[in-house]
């Protein structure tokens, strides 16, 4: 049985959507460095729901090079839950912020990160696990420049709160239109939409749809992709928050919104940012898209060629 006392807390390294994250040493495993995530429960008095424990237990089986490993679950008493993850000290948001403005991530780097991101998602989707809250902050990068997905499956176990632990509003910038329009049925397409938004952001060095409210987010999407209708998105009229009175915008070419991306990249992005979730490209199909044909993910030199190394980012999360 794993006990909280097996872990020696070093420092607080961040506050995520679900609670505080500490850097800690695992005394039972040669003092390996881990991330100790204390989950804040919505109703402290009711304890940890058994459904959440079941969901999280399944995540321990998710072993993939592009997914942050969940080592252990500590249910210290009926009201507290800690998740023990492998420790990675940099996320994609901080990494992008560290590169001087005017300097791109580099086409090879973007392709490498996209390949790794989609591989991780394919693995999760093949196990019927959705993320539902993908964003640059929960894409972590190791010292070799490999990208790994964090917080997969937590949305199903705990729900996606409206406000993060720090009371800041959870970002809407990567949220799929079917969720924004009040849809209650999600599919793997919600994650592929988020991947498209992250793809565009890596190319542009700024978010594609930086809305500050749900309606602002919806209208920012419409201004670029056009206002959807029944023809391009069957049954959109039945979504609770869709209004026939929405302004009618025409679709713009994505090459105008993401000018640095080549034709194959634009085609892939176009297939990710499809309104109808059933027609959105899957992770499996995305990996065989021509955009990746000239990608050699084994070439780790790309990481240093295109970019600043990450040694200087130690102790960040």
From Swiss-Prot:
Residue stretches making up the Protein kinase domain: 7-292
Record keywords: ATP-binding, Cell cycle, Cell division, Kinase, Mitosis, Nucleotide-binding, Phosphoprotein, Serine/threonine-protein kinase, Transferase
Summary of activators and inhibitors of this protein: Phosphorylation at Thr-17 or Tyr-18 inactivates the enzyme, while phosphorylation at Thr-166 activates it.
Modification Phosphothreonine occurs at: 17, 166
One term of GO molecular function: RNA polymerase II complex binding
Segments for region (Disordered): 296-317
PTM: Phosphorylated at Tyr-18 by SWE1 in a cell cycle-dependent manner. Yeast-form and hyphal cells display similar dynamics of phosphorylation and dephosphorylation of Tyr-18. Tyr-18 phosphorylation leads to inhibition of CDC28 kinase activity.
Domain of life: Eukaryota
Subunit details: Forms several complexes with cyclins CCN1, CLB2, CLN3, and HGC1. The CDC28-CCN1 complex associates with septin CDC11 upon hyphal induction. Interacts with IQG1, RFA2, and HSP90.
Membership in a protein family: Belongs to the protein kinase superfamily. CMGC Ser/Thr protein kinase family. CDC2/CDKX subfamily.
SUPFAM superfamilies for the chain: Protein kinase-like (PK-like) (SSF56112)
PROSITE patterns, alphabetized: PROTEIN_KINASE_ATP, PROTEIN_KINASE_DOM, PROTEIN_KINASE_ST
Identification of the protein by name: Cyclin-dependent kinase 1
Record-linked Pfam families: Pkinase
Purpose of the protein: Cyclin-dependent kinase that acts as a master regulator of the mitotic and meiotic cell cycles. May drive the G1-S transition. Plays a role in mitotic exit. Plays a role in the expression of morphology-related transcription factors, and especially hyphae-specific genes. Binds distinct cyclin subunits as cells progress through the division cycle or flamentous growth. The CDC28-CLB2 complex regulates cytokinesis partly by phosphorylating the actomyosin ring component IQG1. The CDC28-CLN3 complex phosphorylates SLA1 which regulates cortical actin patch dynamics.
Residues with Phosphotyrosine modification: 18
Keyword Chaperone: no
